[in-house]
């Protein structure tokens, strides 16, 4: 493949609901431009994008795939970097990485299915990253699909920016062509995406007039000259219309709507023309970073004449082909066999060959210029989000904003001794997927696997088995309770072993009461008079309290919020020791704790649930069933409701799946640990009974 400069490049991300036709669209574009000799099918497992075994087995995209294609546009050959993303929400991290380096988006919508949750999420992502967008309507070959109804729904949902650039032509209820609204011309498909001119059907004239007038109004708003010409009834030329519309598409005030049929490979040459004529080159945008040498803001304008800087947006780690770091060149030119400086890691690395990735295939290239996307193999320390530059010109760019994982499961190896293998394999998978996280929960003696959703975790388990030949089981995690007391108690702890010879003797009288501070295990004080307990044994008594707080007497959970006061005791001049007084204090703690109305505390989370208004009743009802307390509700800038609530952490298990079910997938949530609160009696009873064997081990 040739080397292309910034003005000849388009970086376009394919977004949309799962199953809408993104991968088929990418496949058709590759086929039409000659990048492939035949068009693969998802059902046959031979598409460019979905090459991973898990994707072939499940027949949907799991990872973002890069598909560079070449196309002869109006100004000569150009390169289009297609980023085909997953549509299922569990893999949103892949989508966010792709969107962060795209300069425009194609939102793929299935005409029959209409606006789906994935359509709305795609639109929100484009808004968040300020991406120009085109809507490409697929499945036009389905005679039950109504393009007109879909456009009306799009206008109602997304506003006046929706602009049909085409209207369908049907004969005998079959999709055979379209009307080009910009050029006011009919197009009939001949062979696949090829077409010939044809008459505009009479039934299209009314809708054509409406669509055409809307486009001309947008053209008129571009300048005062155009506005005057519009009101005087003067016609615009096609090139004037295209130039004006391009400005509106780039600033997002117009969203072209196009159409096609993936199964028949129709409409894709027109889509390529729109990418060429209306979507921006990388230099229409800026990449903001910091000049490390000065600490000042740095603005990259995709100029290949200045020093090199690039941002790594994705990492592929494959046991067979190795590690590839995918990056977008922000400034300068990256050349093979050169030395780069990883600004985040403050270290230099050697670059070997440079590649373009087309699905699983690698294409070697002599250089990568600003605005382009490519890959470098076998970088040692470089990870997703890192900036590479030259040591003499260190620039660092902001890392991509990736969704935080809130779903987690406990995992353990099926085969004893595989722990290190699993840990190594997960490290590789976490390099690829920033929404995947492994946590060693030492308190509960469990390993936790975090992700966006259950489906993602299921795929991870399958990858561990198929890629790395290690097997793990997922199960419900344990939750970290705490123990405390609700009233005051006064007890004695006496440890005495005097059966001849040097013995052991320690005697303490102590008070235990709530400290009022659940953020610390205990507060220790002493009020001993007359030397009943020598001062040199006070630290041993406190140590006994501290060790007792590690595993409480009620259910072997850590103790919090206890005030322990040493008030009296006795000692033996020969047999007393630090060990004896520590043991006596532990005996006193256990007895005093159990006499002070002990209770279990459960972890409480501060939860925010974001849903459209129509789902608020169901969501709040469900939160009440989960023992949640709704604190309030506010609207956000997307017109959705944000419900705030306190809820026990244990009740959030499985919440991701249930929330999606309640809201059709549109609902999202986030939470953070807030505090501990007393658990209901039935919860306490169950925990105490289940952990009785652990408490018995505390006997002294």
Question: How would you name each of these model-derived features?
Answer:
Residues 1-700:
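Structural and coupling elements of P-loop NTPases
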